[in-house]
């Protein structure tokens, strides 16, 4: 298991690499290029600069999150082939600089969705939160405005302004796209992408829908064991893999996260793990919590044990954290709570390994 930490890059993150380097275990960096429009080729010089910046700080960069998929690909429009060719070239460029895993998602229009970016928890910390009634009743344009107003001046991943300017047009286009068609469009994309991924030795890792159910009537196809099996079957290759996000899939209590890790891990399809906890209050209503098992609804010991049991060699990172100790930054991506998360997850990993030796 290789522990990592997401960093949004100079000018896009309130956290500096020298602070990340001080986290026990010195995690690897997960990052991306944020000033290239979705669908365009990532230039080699930008990738090189990012790689050198990370390495000059004494850290490693082997995982990219994310190379976003253009909406025309998800919609299956004739223009998708140009964007797919650009995606292929981006993979080739990334491979030249030692990138091993690319995380991506296939969620229509919106990436992760929350009703509150700074809900005050009983301990005084703030966290991302989801209330089904609020989300389904709010106008999508209003939600975009609220996200922009409450992001502390940062552009949030999956909520890039250039993608959301055409919201009305996108919703109209998606009226003719159901889950079956979206899955078909994903298959078209994967059949073009995976051969290139195999050629350049980059593992593709699809991220689950967050949350794992439909919002605003949009289709969702990455939400359960059954849906993940369908996606793996689209292209039967170890390079067609998964980012197993415990918080995303775990928002639905029907998803047994340790069982999913063992099932898809045994098939060699998990390349990246997002390990975080959530507190489920009722069906489709949850807050994000600290990583500690007792603070949420997921058993983090069992999750890490499942990874240990499959002898996981891929990458893991703590996911969204609370904002604690007065920190102000990108919602969900502060330093302190995620650093605590790394210490906790590393502690579980060490303890599990030593317990096995004793037993």
Curated annotation (Swiss-Prot):
<dbReference type="Pfam" id="PF03786">
    <property type="entry name" value="UxuA"/>
</dbReference>
<dbReference type="InterPro" id="IPR004628">
    <property type="entry name" value="Man_deHydtase"/>
</dbReference>
<comment type="similarity">
    <text>Belongs to the mannonate dehydratase family.</text>
</comment>
<dbReference type="GO" id="GO:0030145">
    <property type="term" value="F:manganese ion binding"/>
</dbReference>
<comment type="function">
    <text>Catalyzes the dehydration of D-mannonate.</text>
</comment>
<dbReference type="InterPro" id="IPR036237">
    <property type="entry name" value="Xyl_isomerase-like_sf"/>
</dbReference>
<keyword id="KW-0464">Manganese</keyword>
<keyword id="KW-0456">Lyase</keyword>
<protein>
    <recommendedName>
        <fullName>Mannonate dehydratase</fullName>
        <ecNumber>4.2.1.8</ecNumber>
    </recommendedName>
</protein>
<dbReference type="GO" id="GO:0008927">
    <property type="term" value="F:mannonate dehydratase activity"/>
</dbReference>
<dbReference type="GO" id="GO:0008198">
    <property type="term" value="F:ferrous iron binding"/>
</dbReference>
<dbReference type="GO" id="GO:0042840">
    <property type="term" value="P:D-glucuronate catabolic process"/>
</dbReference>
<comment type="pathway">
    <text>Carbohydrate metabolism; pentose and glucuronate interconversion.</text>
</comment>
<keyword id="KW-0408">Iron</keyword>
């Amino acid at each position: 298991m290789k522990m990592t930490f997401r960093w949004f890059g100079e000018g896009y993150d309130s956290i500096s690499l020298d602070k990340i380097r001080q986290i026990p275990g010195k995690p690897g960096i997960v990052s991306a290029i944020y000033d290239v429009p979705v669908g365009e080729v990532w230039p080699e010089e930008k990738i090189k600069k990012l790689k050198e910046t990370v390495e000059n700080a004494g850290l490693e960069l082997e995982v990219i999150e994310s190379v976003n998929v253009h909406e025309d690909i998800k919609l299956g429009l004739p223009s998708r082939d140009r964007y797919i060719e650009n995606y292929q070239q981006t993979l080739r460029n990334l491979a030249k600089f030692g990138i091993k895993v690319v995380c991506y998602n296939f969620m229509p229009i919106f990436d992760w969705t929350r009703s509150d970016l700074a809900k005050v928890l009983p301990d005084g910390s703030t966290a991302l939160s989801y209330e089904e009634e609020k989300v389904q009743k709010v106008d999508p344009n209003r939600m975009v405005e609220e996200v922009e107003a409450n992001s502390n001046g940062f552009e949030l991943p999956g909520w890039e302004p250039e993608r959301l300017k055409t919201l009305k047009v996108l919703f109209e286009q998606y009226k003719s796209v159901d889950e079956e068609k979206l899955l078909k469009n994903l298959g078209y994309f994967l059949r073009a992408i995976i051969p290139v991924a195999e050629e350049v030795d980059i593992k593709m890792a699809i991220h689950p829908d967050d949350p794992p159910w439909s919002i605003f009537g949009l289709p969702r196809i990455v939400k359960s064991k059954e849906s993940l099996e369908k996606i793996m079957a689209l292209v039967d290759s170890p390079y067609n893999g998964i980012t197993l996000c415990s918080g995303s899939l775990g928002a639905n209590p029907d998803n047994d996260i340790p069982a999913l890790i063992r099932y898809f891990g045994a098939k060699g399809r998990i390349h990246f793990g997002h390990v975080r906890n959530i507190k489920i209050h009722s069906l489709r209503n949850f807050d994000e919590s600290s990583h500690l098992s007792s603070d949420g609804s997921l058993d983090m010991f069992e999750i890490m044990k499942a990874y240990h049991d499959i002898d996981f060699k891929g990458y893991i990172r703590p996911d969204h954290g609370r904002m604690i100790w007065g920190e102000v930054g990108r919602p969900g991506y502060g330093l302190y709570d995620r650093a605590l998360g790394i210490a906790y997850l590393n502690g579980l990993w060490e303890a599990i390994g030593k317990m096995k030796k004793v037993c």
